[in-house]
Amino acid sequence: MLKLFSAFRKDKIWDFDGGIHPPEMKTQSNGTPLRQVPLAPRFVIPLKQHIGAEGELCVSVGDRVLRGQALTRGRGRMLPVHAPTSGTVIAIAPHSTAHPSALAELSVIIDADGEDRWIEREGWSDYRAHSREALIERIHQYGVAGLGGAGFPTGVKLQGGGDKITTLIINAAECEPYITADDRLMQDCAAQIVEGIRILAHILQPREVLIGIEDNKPQAISMLRAVLADAHDISLRVIPTKYPSGGAKQLTQILTGKQVPHGGRSSDIGVLMQNVGTAYAVKRAVVDGEPITERVVTLTGEAVSRPGNVWARLGTPVRHLLNDAGFCPSADQMVIMGGPLMGFTLPWLDVPVVKITNCLLAPSVTEMGAPQEEKSCIRCSACADACPADLLPQQLYWFSKGQQHDKATAHHIADCIECGACAWVCPSNIPLVQYFRQEKAEINAIRLEEKRAAEAKARFEARQARLEREKAARLARHKSAAVQPAAKDQDAIAAALARVKEKQAQATQPVVIQAGSLPDNSAVIAAREARKAQARAKQAAHPVADSAIPGDDPRKAAVEAAIARAKARKQEQQAGSEPAEPVDPRKAAVEAAIARAKARKQEQQAGSEPAEAVDPRKAAVEAAIARAKARKQEQQAGGEPAEAVDPRKAAVEAAIARAKARKQEQQTGSEPAEPVDPRKAAVEAAIARAKARKQEQQAGSEPAEPADPRKAAVAAAIARVQAKKAAQQQVVNED
């Protein structure tokens, strides 16, 4: 009983809802064998002949190509295309292709040389010796795609199936009227088709392989049964003729009883389907090593005098094929690529044959009938009864016409297979399929725009996040940079304090000076002698020109003479009235060093600077002021106790004085000489002498005030500065 049930289950077929029975019109073309078409002089090969992106070009204009040579590289879902014949690439430009709107796509245009030479072909006769991955890659690189109409890359489809495929279905139904390409291919090439099916089964390793064919193809059924007479791995299932039983979901339900869920694929239920033409192309790619460069195309219709099925090279213009079949166009002739229900009308005949082209229908006016006017929907539900996908075409029509995309999506418009059964039975002659195609295209465009917007938003948010991270990092760097200098300053302050403490500690140490001993200044003396020798060497290397020696400055000489006389008188008075003060060796050494430095500086200035003009008036004034201050200092006398002498500090100060003196020796300058007016100088000298006498009289009559040597020195310096400024102003006025 169980065996009987299994046998019944093995040969059982199911049915699907809906469907129609239009006139088949297949006898026009299925009675003649396949034939070759003469080569066209020019071929147009679109880069995209499948679902997915176009491949990357690997040829350029002017290249010579052979038949089967790859024109593009296939990576991922990109499927390569190959040259249909040998010739020369004359252009790579957009060209109208097989599309309802005749959209222009990038194409390679080849001028045939008539030789039709193949590339070197390498077949895998023992395909079982190769791995599954190698077979899939070969199928993909040889450009095999679904030849039943979808054009999905076969290699990608096989790769996606993986190990979850339990049933492999070969679609041989070919249910649409007029089309007999698969029927004729099964009659003439049944053995090659079965070999291709076994290659697919070897790759997928399914539990069962089923061939579904309609009962209106008796010759093809007999040929397949003859080839499968001794085969137990492939089952042939003959199904009733009903349109659209050749749809993937419908044939799956007929052969397995399983329904593909809404929005899903047949692989979700463990089923993978391939067309008989695809199986034949797989055999030629794997066993013969031939890329897909041609396919079977049905040429039919009453406008064609010699209908039949031909081997058409990919890229052949439609006009060339129809002319070879005896095309006799009428005034308003239409040409349909595909069948009368799922095909589309070509805007012109220069479009090329591609991988999904299975039929070229050229009907007469009487054959297609007069065009009828579209009327309003009467909601008769005939379209819903005929729909094989269990949809509501009348609702989808209203949603599509009203641009209600969300409702159309909710009513599963994506599951529409565009079979045309609803439009066939519509009494109002509404082209429902055209509305559904347009609505699905608009929905796809909206989804694509939403995807692009989401990607743009993601990029913007990523950019904003990156900018925020960079800003935070920049602020952190600024904060660390602001903290680091403070730490460095603290370190510097601490180091300075340490040095001060060290100096204070050294200063507090007692200095022991033995009686009658002198400080050891040998190191300082040696350094001084070395510097003197270095200075003498520099002077010898740079001798001073004798012509640059200027005359003495009478103003400075008078001031210094007056100061010297005042100091001399003061010393005489102190020597006569006060006891002698002890001599401070440190101060004496400092003063001597300063005197030597001044002397050297004057020598260098005399050697490098031009003589300055002497202002006798100001010189006399300064001399008188100096003499008055000297007399005041003479009248002042006092005594201060002698300070203790620190020999170490005296030596340090003497060394510092000598260093300053040498530094002043190295500095040189030059000032331009100012002109002297003898007449004005004599007048100013007389005025100065009068002022000096007046100051002497005032000094003799007024009581003497205590003199401050520091203020006297400051006053003398101010007098010298004013004298220089007055001389400069005089020169400006004279100019």
Swiss-Prot record:
Which parts of the sequence bind [4Fe-4S] cluster 2?
C387, C416, C419, C422
Q: What are the EC numbers?
A: 7.-.-.-
Q: What is its main location?
A: membrane
| Boundaries of every 4Fe-4S ferredoxin-type domain copy | 368-397, 407-436
Q: Which terms does the record give in the GO molecular function aspect?
A: 4 iron, 4 sulfur cluster binding; electron transfer activity; metal ion binding
Q: Which UniProt keywords apply?
A: 4Fe-4S, Cell inner membrane, Cell membrane, Electron transport, Iron, Iron-sulfur, Membrane, Metal-binding, Repeat, Translocase, Transport
- Record's keyword annotation contains Metal-binding: yes
- Segments carrying the region annotation (Disordered) are 534-714
- Where does the chain cross the membrane? none
| InterPro entries xref list | 4Fe4S_Fe-S-bd (IPR017896), 4Fe4S_Fe_S_CS (IPR017900), Ion_transpt_RnfC/RsxC (IPR010208), Nuo51_FMN-bd (IPR011538), Nuo51_FMN-bd_sf (IPR037225), RnfC_N (IPR026902), Soluble_ligand-bd (IPR019554)
A GO CC term assigned to this protein in UniProt:
plasma membrane
The first-level EC class reads translocase
Topology versus the membrane:
Peripheral membrane protein
Q: Where in the cell is it found?
A: Cell inner membrane
Assembly and binders:
The complex is composed of six subunits: RsxA, RsxB, RsxC, RsxD, RsxE and RsxG.
What family is this?
Belongs to the 4Fe4S bacterial-type ferredoxin family. RnfC subfamily.
Functionally, this protein is described as follows: Part of a membrane-bound complex that couples electron transfer with translocation of ions across the membrane. Required to maintain the reduced state of SoxR.
What is the name of the protein in this document?
Ion-translocating oxidoreductase complex subunit C
- Source species, please? Salmonella heidelberg (strain SL476)
